Amino acid sequence: MAKYEILYIIRPNIEEEAKNALVARFDSILTDNGATVVESKDWEKRRLAYEIQDFREGIYHVVNVEANDATALNEFDRLSKINGDILRHMIVKLDA
């Protein structure tokens, strides 16, 4: 299984319950499509280098994933692009 790290930035004015639901939803998207979530944690609320959608801060969330193929990652990528609560995301394949 290949190991991946996903980092996404959540808008800072989201309520705690909505943020937890968003994280749970995107973790389940990964697991429903065949990936294994090793770790999913909030990093911290940080100032952004530049404004994204009129926000100067964002809540960083990191997910470590193991997957056999890119199906789960492609679905995560597709859905995170159309979700208004996620400002940016990045998927990186980790070295073995």
Curated annotation (Swiss-Prot):
Any one Pfam family match given in the protein's UniProt record, by short name: Ribosomal_S6
Molecular function per GO: small ribosomal subunit rRNA binding; structural constituent of ribosome
InterPro entries, sorted: Ribosomal_bS6, Ribosomal_bS6_sf, Ribosomal_S6_plastid/chlpt, Transl_elong_EF1B/ribsomal_bS6
Entry keyword rRNA-binding: yes
Entry's Gene Ontology BP terms: translation
Entry keywords, A to Z: Ribonucleoprotein, Ribosomal protein, RNA-binding, rRNA-binding
GO CC annotation terms, alphabetical: cytoplasm; ribonucleoprotein complex; ribosome
Function: Binds together with bS18 to 16S ribosomal RNA.
Family indicated by similarity: Belongs to the bacterial ribosomal protein bS6 family.
Matching NCBIfam families: S6 (TIGR00166)
UniProt xrefs under HAMAP family: Ribosomal_bS6
Name of the protein this chain belongs to: Small ribosomal subunit protein bS6
Origin species: Streptococcus thermophilus (strain ATCC BAA-491 / LMD-9)
Gene: rpsF
